[in-house]
Amino acid sequence: MDRRVSGPPPVPPLETPGRRREENINEKETTTVRSPRRSVLISTAAVYAAMYAALALLFNPISYGVINLRVANVLIGLVPLIGWPAVLGQTLGVLIANQPAFGDPLGPIDLINVAPSFLFSLLLWKLRNKSVFLGLALYSVALGITVSYALNYAFNLPLLVEIPQVTAGIFIATAVLGYLLFRAVKRLGALQRMFPN
């Protein structure tokens, strides 16, 4: 016969004001640890966009039109290393640089290029472990086509001439110089430690 006597059930810890205060402090500490990360991502995207817009303005004569050797696009080489902040920074930078008030001669029609810029920057980031150069090349071709259509709409320029010329300019800045920037910064390793992805 089992003579063991079961004791009373364990009493849960008392919900004292001191205990609640301690739990609130722990929650605040967790939030404080997370929030700097978010602020770093937001500030990185903002700095990237500002740099893009500044470079587009500085090299305005060659950043638009048929030449379209937009030096600002060199920054896209940082997208595979930084990730989402750079994708958003690239998109916001294009949005700012393509404003008519900012000096874009094409007018509002050039704002359509914000969408492919976002999509192909995101694709570049997704391809970071497969082929960065392929991602940069796809970005160049896609933007070469959409910018050429914008030029055709604004100035009635022939697409057969525009697409190769515009794509070549974007390719040089993006796939060639952007890839060189990617290789150089990757070799340093600093961004990989700041933005592990």
Language model regions located:
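Membrane topogenic helices and adjacent juxtamembrane segments
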Residues: 4, 12-51, 157, 182, ...
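Residue-identity detector for threonine
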Residues: 16, 30-32, 44, 91, ...
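A subset of signal/propeptide-processing and intrinsically disordered low-complexity segments
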Residues: 17-24, 55, 68, 105
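Hydrophobic transmembrane alpha-helices
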Residues: 27-92
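Membrane-embedded alpha-helical hairpins and interfacial helices in multi-pass inner-membrane proteins
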Residues: 57-71, 95-197
